[in-house]
Amino acid sequence: AGFDPAFIVLSPLDLSVDSIYNRGADIALQIRRMAFTERSGLTVSDMTGDIGMDASGISLAGVTLKAPFSRIEANISAGEGILALAPDSPLKADLMADVNTKDLKYLYPALIPPVLDGRIVSLALTAAGTLGDIGKAGLDISSPGHVAFTADGAARNVLDPGRMEASARFEGDFRDMAFLEALLSDSALR
């Protein structure tokens, strides 16, 4: 059936929180362990990290999520204007993931065709600057034996499409792309 955000059921839920702080709009949560299986079948075997929101902004520090075949790590901080999409809001993100399509299949079964079943995709994303001017961004995507792709760059006036400027450098090593043929319908692209 897949994941339905309107009907989330976690069972069983194993949750260990070191501390919770809440005062007005300020929230801080230190998750020492969280494990669950969602109704779709996706299992999170371990999640840890610190989550916070206060007058200075929002942060995820040392957040690690492990599923049976996947792992995601995130460190993200954003200034107080991030929710209002303020262009001058500071932004820093560092995200690393090794995702196996076996885990993704529980969320969106139709998204993973048989040719992609059991495929590992590694991703590293970094960004620093403000929401309006990303001074430095990087993206690395790879799938062992198939593709290794790197992009880095910067963008200015991101929230103003009429004034937006961006520069990027791309590099890729596409070793075995035969699986793409199975993903394309019978068309001129094939």
Q: Which residues fall in each region the model found?
A:
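Interface amphipathic segments
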Residues: 1-190
